[in-house]
Amino acid sequence: MYLFHLCLVFACVPCPTVQASKLCLGWLWGMDIDPYKEFGSSYQLLNFLPLDFFPDLNALVDTATALYEEELTGREHCSPHHTAIRQALVCWDELTKLIAWMSSNITSEQVRTIIVNHVNDTWGLKVRQSLWFHLSCLTFGQHTVQEFLVSFGVWIRTPAPYRPPNAPILSTLPEHTVIRRRGGARASRSPRRRTPSPRRRRSQSPRRRRSQSPSANC
């Protein structure tokens, strides 16, 4: 995707598409573009997670294909997360083709290794982060992922003697965190079930007959 925009810019074709390509490549001119801002997150929060936290790219691609193949290949717009996953998959496919082309045209094995490692450590990491983030938002919910990133960021920046030994875990986060709304009120997750009150046991003694009034006997 980015290679397409680069070719249009370098070719200097006088058409509106070039202007759009320059906007898409705004990061080349030092623009602060954070693709996670519209989802309530940021690169900074994701960078708190260690590099080995994100699964392998092949595993992420297989997961996205197994869960959302119909939505990703269809024409309809499902959600911004599906669109972001599409873009990440297309970007990684183009980078894979670029690496294959360089591997076949560069004779020096040392240079090939340096280029492949650089792509995996930079763009490969960004694609892994993007796929993990959007797949997690679709699986656990965007708000839950935001809470996890904030909790992990606070945990990792807290000195070891003053923090819990285990880091927050995304899959168990909703069970252990208390989300507070404005005004200090706690957000209720699910209504509590009221335990049924025990029924009163009827007395086994026979009922007393009402005494008849004297007027009734007359």
From Swiss-Prot:
Example of a GO biological process term: microtubule-dependent intracellular transport of viral material towards nucleus
Recorded superkingdom: Viruses
Start and end residues of each stretch annotated as 3 X 8 AA repeats of S-P-R-R-R-R-S-Q: 190-212
PTM annotation, UniProt: Phosphorylated.
GO terms of molecular function: DNA binding; RNA binding; structural molecule activity
Annotated signal peptide: 1-20
Record-marked site positions (Cleavage): R189, S190
Cell compartments where the protein resides: Secreted; Host nucleus
Residue numbers spanned by region HBEAG: 26-28
Keywords: Disulfide bond, Host nucleus, Host-virus interaction, Repeat, Secreted, Signal, Viral immunoevasion
Pfam families from the UniProt entry: Hep_core_N, Hepatitis_core
Region (Disordered): 180-218
GO cellular component, one term: host cell nucleus
Sequence repeat boundaries on the chain: 190-196, 197-204, 205-212
Residue ranges of the propeptide: 190-218
Principal subcellular localization: secreted
The keyword Signal is annotated on this UniProt entry: yes
Feature: compositional bias, Basic residues: 180-211
InterPro entries: Hepatitis_B_virus_capsid_N, Hepatitis_core, Viral_capsid_core_dom_sf_HBV
Record's function text: May regulate immune response to the intracellular capsid in acting as a T-cell tolerogen, by having an immunoregulatory effect which prevents destruction of infected cells by cytotoxic T-cells. This immune regulation may predispose to chronicity during perinatal infections and prevent severe liver injury during adult infections.
UniProt record similarity statement: Belongs to the orthohepadnavirus precore antigen family.
Assembly notes: Homodimerizes.
Protein name, entry field: External core antigen
Species per Swiss-Prot/TrEMBL record: Woodchuck hepatitis B virus (isolate 1)
Gene that this sequence comes from: C
